[in-house]
Amino acid sequence: MKIVHHGKITLPLILAPALSAFALPAFAAEDTMVVSATPGPISELDTPAAVSVVNGDDMRQAAPRVNLSESLGSVPGLQVQNRQNYAQDLQLSVRGFGSRSTYGVRGIRMYVDGIPATMPDGQGQTSNIDINSVESIEVLRGPFSALYGNASGGVINVTTTTGTQPPTLEASTYYGSFGSWRNSVKATGATGDGTQAGDVDYAISASRFTTHGYRDHSSAQKNLGNAKLGVRLNEASKLTLLLNSVDIDANDPGGLTEQEWHDNPTQAPRAEQYNTRKTTKQTQAGLRYDRQLTANDDLSVMMYAGVRETTQYQSIPVAPQLNPTHPGGVIELARHYQGIDSRWTHRGDLLSVPVKFTTGLDYETMSEKRKGYENFVVENGTTVLGEKGDLRRDERNLMWNVDPYLQTAWQFTDKLSLDAGVRFSSVYFDSNDQYIVGKNGDDSGDASYHKWLPAAALKYAVTDAWNIYTSAGRGFETPTINELSYRDNGQSGLNFGLKPSTSDTIEIGSKTRVGNGLFSAALFQTDTDDEIVADQSSGGRTTYKNAGKTRRQGMELSADSQFAEDWRVKMAWTYLDATYRSNACGTDSCEGNRIPGIARNMGYASLAYAPPEGFYAGADIRYMSDIQANDENTAKAPSYTVASLNSGYKLRIQESWMLDVWGRVDNLFDREYVGSVIVNEGNSRYYEPAPGRNYGVGVNLSYTFM
């Protein structure tokens, strides 16, 4: 669906006490989100789901433009934490889904211009998202996210800029604490207005980021490129080429115990001993074809392919690796992935009821070559750590899924509508063990998982300005290949005993337009069977288990208010009670305990003065309640509140040049806090510290060809 902001409305009396002090804003840009659960463009107000839109220009305003954690704090239900570890990516969770991840993103489906940033098995990453190119980011929560298939506890959809006339060149630089540098260039433009055959639009960007890192042994460098080229074939069809490449070389500082964190949060003793590090190279290309078949029928086909290569050195001691079944302390991965998603949309009437149908087929596949090596060598009788040694693992893994889906939207009356859909998700794994030596036997195997995923929402328009809705759906999450890759107690082979989880969600919500702004509220409950959680994590390696039954209950509130010209305030609050409903701790009972990695309360507020030119300034404050670090709830990261300030000046020089000079300070009051936790870390090294007060300055310069 396409989410747009429009229309001037009045506040329903039931919500007036909460927002009587505010007149919500007119949005300067059209925010969009394509949600296959509801075909066709409708407004955000009319969307029967919890969804939030973050504008790309807002993300870049006086910001480093390096991590999504800089700008997504205003999204309720989304917990985004910076590990200060570029080897392991950000920690993202939506309503608690994804909190178990010790690296990368799990439990959430991510897309960039329609291409999955989530692998077919459910493992995702944010490292290839170029903030300089972002047009908007949309976060979908609740039952309808399940219609995206496997591992979709939530959906994050990134849309990049489409070039328009007149052409523009932009260069920007940022320098911050800990020796952090980012330099970027971008070019956008078009040869026509995009409606005539032969019209071409383009958006090309590149950036380089380097940092010494806040902690010891946390330096990193990243090169990122993104390109989007569109060609209008005729008045009814368009072809879009998408290219993306990222190259990361990062040290891995690892986690700290509570005592180590208090003694010196910047230390990384084991990381330096083992020289833990990770390199990642990914290149992908996509081709999207859109055609209007008739006035009532549309066709869209997306094809993509890519390769991702990773080498990681872990802090695993020598002694465990002497076990002949141990896979070693160095991981080498080579992944090739591709897919195609084709869909047809029809608009018409059925039994005199206006209806939209979207049906399609989504096919994804990935092949992985996984090798493991010892992380030490012996030279002249001396053991040298942090070097690639003998081969200890060699396997070829295949994974693919084939998902047909159908979504419908029915408009029964002017006030009552129904959105409903179903997806049949089939996921297949196959592993071929090619390292059969001595006591290390053949650990080949295969598994397949199948599940019907229905979702439906009923919406009622109380007034033109106020909609209420109720929705329900079923989600499905298989283990990722990484989660299958290791068994407990150092056993060899894949963990095919790990089962997929299923989740049933119900939600009720209310959306109210005030002026041209929006106030949203949602209540939800999710019950999960066989939830996949971290069993034990040590030395950078994590094993997983099924936790039986869990429950998530919560509430989300958000508001966006413009109370005077160029002044804007945003607020969001999330309450999430996520608990085990059965024992996930073996001999010790943790039924009723909180699921680790999830904050029970999150709050955000920001105030900005942002005229199109001249002086601007902003401030924000974030609150995070304590986060349990293990299943037993015997360790936790304390709650914290941090504030940030930014200010800058935009100067237009003649008509073509725009200069933007800015500065910011984060963690204004120099709070000491934990940025994220490593769930169930076996040596109690749960804590990944966040930096104290830190600073940054930047300059952006653009030229528009008039």
Question: Which stretches of residues belong to each language-model region?
Answer:
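Short acidic/polar hinge/loop motifs at secondary-structure boundaries
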Residues: 108, 115-141
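A beta-strand signature from Gram-negative outer-membrane beta-barrel systems
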Residues: 129-172
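Transmembrane beta-barrel wall of Gram-negative outer-membrane proteins
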Residues: 168, 175-210, 215-253, 277-294, ...
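Membrane-embedded beta-barrel scaffold of Gram-negative outer-membrane proteins
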Residues: 195, 288-290, 298-316, 461, ...
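Face-selective signature of the C-terminal outer-membrane beta-barrel domain
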Residues: 238-244, 279-436, 461, 519-523, ...
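Conserved C-terminal beta-signal and adjacent last beta-strands/turns
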Residues: 244, 470, 506, 560, ...
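Surface-exposed extracellular loop regions of Gram-negative outer-membrane beta-barrel proteins
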Residues: 249-263, 367-374, 428-437, 446, ...
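Gram-negative outer-membrane beta-barrel transporters
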Residues: 344-346, 351, 413-414, 426, ...
